[in-house]
Amino acid sequence: MATTVYGQASLPQMHSLFSKVRPFLSHSPSFTAPFTRRRSFPFSALPTTKAIDAALMKEKWLDSLSLTSQDEDTTPENAESSCIIGIDPDLSGALALLKFDHLGSSSFAQVYDTPHIPVLVGKRVRKRLDAKSIVQLIQSLDVPSGSRVYIEQSNPFPKDGKQGWYSGGFGYGLWIGTLVASGFCVIPVSASLWKRHFQLASGSCTKDDSRRVAAELFPSLSSQLKRKKDHGRAEALLIAAYGEALKTEKLLIQPKELLSQVNYLENQLVEVK
């Protein structure tokens, strides 16, 4: 099998991604925009002015993660394909690239391990992301400027310790800064959202389950998902597939849509009064 400089297979054929992703949609709860953990709009819990402020802040935050407008389609009219990138930003994570033609009839996938280097921290050698190699990896993808990148939000846990908190925040920030500077539209997604989408959010689910689901969606990449340490590859693929499902099924609610719904509710309240 032909490999790239990063040791990954070159553009293997995906196997009916849409036919396998869509069944999850019918069993998944409705989704709000990334960052939103509630399953429905929190109008009953928040005054409408606070809901508007929250929507505006989220819109400004998302705008700051892209050099192009979130609503602007930067794909050239004569382009033969569109791209979605999914990233697990951890040191053991990966970058997944999905390519689709305009008819959705053929799809390709690639996955790359996150480049990292050994660094001496005190008296211990630790891993840190290799910024230069990440830039080179992104440049080698040949992805149109303005393409969407879905990256898992960094949410450190108390048990991770200071080094875990530092490493997680450093990696997350490095990825976002590099992606925005490279001209991508970056959309952070909480782990609970994409895992719930693929029915992996229950306490009994493990990283092995992520590898299993990813292998089912991407059978041509199953050989790269066999080892336990390949969970980062699996999660990057699932994050990318989740992003494509949001785009295809129009489940991603934009802040402007939220504002229009807030305005509608305000008008309803005025009529009641």
Curated annotation (Swiss-Prot):
This is Holliday junction resolvase MOC1, chloroplastic. GO terms for molecular function: crossover junction DNA endonuclease activity; four-way junction DNA binding; metal ion binding. RNAi mutant displays chloroplasts with no chlorophyll and aberrant nucleoid morphology. PANTHER family: HOLLIDAY JUNCTION RESOLVASE MOC1, CHLOROPLASTIC-RELATED (PTHR36015:SF6). Changing residue 88 to A: Abolishes endonucleolytic activity. Signal peptide: none annotated. Residues 1-53 form a transit peptide. Keywords: Chloroplast, DNA recombination, DNA-binding, Endonuclease, Hydrolase, Magnesium, Manganese, Metal-binding, Nuclease, Plastid, Transit peptide. It comes from Arabidopsis thaliana. It catalyses: Endonucleolytic cleavage at a junction such as a reciprocal single-stranded crossover between two homologous DNA duplexes (Holliday junction). It is an enzyme of class 3 (hydrolase). CDD domains: MOC1. Changing residue 152 to A: Abolishes endonucleolytic activity. Changing residue 230 to A: Abolishes endonucleolytic activity. Its EC number is 3.1.21.10. It is found in: Plastid, Chloroplast stroma, Chloroplast nucleoid. Disruption phenotype: Albino phenotype and decrease in cpDNA copy number. Its cofactor is Mg(2+); Mn(2+).
